């Protein structure tokens, strides 16, 4: 599956790891905000999301770090969606 197919998967969850301030300035409807600095302490929440789990941020750097951390914790169906505006363009 390519990224667009993953984002539009009926069971996909999208998590934005930007700060709450950045999130409030604009975000994709239906996206959950869990800032990067809270990913580790909120690991149990990530385990409850339906998959595929798509992570996004401003440019893809923070979401990439979060995705690598989650994969290292045993979550397998996790993807770095890149910047939230890119995810928005791919969402149908």
Per-region residue spans from a language model:
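Rhodanese-like catalytic fold shared by cysteine-dependent sulfurtransferases
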Residues: 1-13, 17-51, 61-92
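Short, surface-exposed ligand- or partner-binding patches at beta-edge/loop junctions that are enriched
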Residues: 56
